[in-house]
């Protein structure tokens, strides 16, 4: 550690690489925190977690008992064990006893991306509600045609305040906070929509995953989806071609090259004669193929591409990377796939097998450096390498199925919740405070041996 600090002072390593090195070291040492504890007020499984995008300080949770709570991640409300364990109780909670509370389970709870003055909850009681954080009162509500599975708002929107809602209905609805009405609906799925995710590179692009196994890309400024992901369409044909000159070919003698020169000249003369005839035919053929492709991809026409599937089952989770280049998806077939957003192709990253819940949606999250994917896998949380698919971390601590993963990039902490009604904190191990505690414990020990 001190050597790295010295290298940073002398200029041997840059500041960003120095910070990334320590962040990656902290993330790879995540373990169940013995210094921070959230006191959960929920009496049902916790289905949603999110840290606010402005300060990274307030944690919002939604549970199956119809309650939503807000926690302060940085400031503890109480201390135990001589100040070693920080207890974080909720700042306030909204439950069924509230006059505007939800009657049934809350499936999604998200922050308003601009500030912490508003938050949004979606419930199985067919309502989506917008809450004022300061007064804990519902200011806007939207009546949905069915159970609300997932809600999302764009973190980079400057021209709209739309909430995308995925319900058990086949249509995705966009709710406008400013007008208090539905902006428009997106039709294309053949079953309920279990996951929605906004693009991190464009405020107009929305990704949806349905129970029909399809992942659709929408531009909300136009009618119809402009892309349907197909798990059989891979990047194999889009990779750079193999170089013709190999190591063996480069060792050919000059005599052999000269002998082949005459044959190559004859071939070039023949190709010039036949090339002029074939160019016209090939150009017309390419044009016809491109026209047919455009016709098939057109959103208003039914085709085989429109019925493509990304998973053999429902799409239970979606997560776009922070750079906006890749999309992660999880399905009820217990598969995780990484998609290239620009081409819409499967990158064929082979994530190691793990059981994923099939009857409800899950919440994925990612870290940038190192590039990890945190996935709820039944009672455990697995961190996969985004490019290798290998299991880097396996976190055990929940007694029942894990529903959500929420990574706090400011403190390099991971928050998870499950059907055991608990919210657990996973913090980096090997910190200076942990070493001090170990030293104090070692001083209290005697020197007697057994």
UniProtKB/Swiss-Prot annotation:
Protein name, as recorded: WD repeat-containing protein ATCSA-1
Function comment: Involved in UV-B tolerance and genome integrity. In association with DDB2, is necessary for repair of UV-B-induced DNA lesions.
Keywords on record: DNA damage, DNA repair, Nucleus, Repeat, WD repeat
Subcellular location: Nucleus
Biological process terms in GO annotation: DNA repair; response to UV-B; transcription-coupled nucleotide-excision repair
Null mutant phenotype: No visible phenotype under normal growth conditions, but mutant plants exhibit sensitivity to UV-B and decreased DNA repair activity following UV-B treatment.
Lineage, broadest ranks: Eukaryota, Viridiplantae, Streptophyta, Embryophyta, Tracheophyta
InterPro entries with a match to the protein in the record: G-protein_beta_WD-40_rep, Rad28/ERCC8/Ckn1/ATCSA-1, WD40/YVTN_repeat-like_dom_sf, WD40_repeat_CS, WD40_repeat_dom_sf, WD40_rpt
Lineage top rank: taxon: Eukaryota
UniProt-listed Pfam families: WD40
Gene symbol of the encoding locus: ATCSA-1
Subunit field text: Interacts with DDB1A.
Positions of region (Disordered): 269-298
